[in-house]
Amino acid sequence: MSTGELKANAREQLRGYWAVAVGTVLVTTILIDSGALYTVSEYFDMAEIGISCNLIALFLGGVISTGLCKFLLDIVTKGQEPKFKTLFSQFNIYLKTLGLNIIIYLSIAIGYILFIIPGIIISLMFSQAYYILAEDNSKSINQCLSESVEMMKGYKWDLFCLELSFIGWWIIVALTFGIASLWVSPYVKVTETNFYLNIKNK
């Protein structure tokens, strides 16, 4: 499936669900996007807030990311009615999501320390792990990571190009001081979910 088809599907799938998608992705960003929150902390010149934001992202990032993936899968597959509360549905496997988040975070961080390209490659390799766990909570951390790596063989460049295709939209986000991200972020996330299902079924 081409990038254009993935995006077209996302727009169609979001029809009727924009409100709940915007709210869910916005809360996700507030809770785990430490970069955005750190910018706020710098504005108030309070370094301790920045540290707190990073800790929140570390300890909540895994469980919220897995919940978001489950929510996004509900939108795309129409298996269940997408609900905001799904974002918080994965606390029953909190320790597993925490371990997964820490391993991914440290692996990507080490990759970026060594050089930017290894960091990008590692992030692409592990990009499907949360989706895998969201679909099957019984899978171990190692299974989620290894299946993501295997799934992304031959598709890392495709995902990289897919992300690049949203540059125009992110420029609009910047020009609107972030307001447009309310609509752009759900659009991107649902498109990424379509990408996951597309390569999973091959």
Residue ranges and their predicted role:
Residues 1-202:
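Hydrophobic alpha-helical membrane segments
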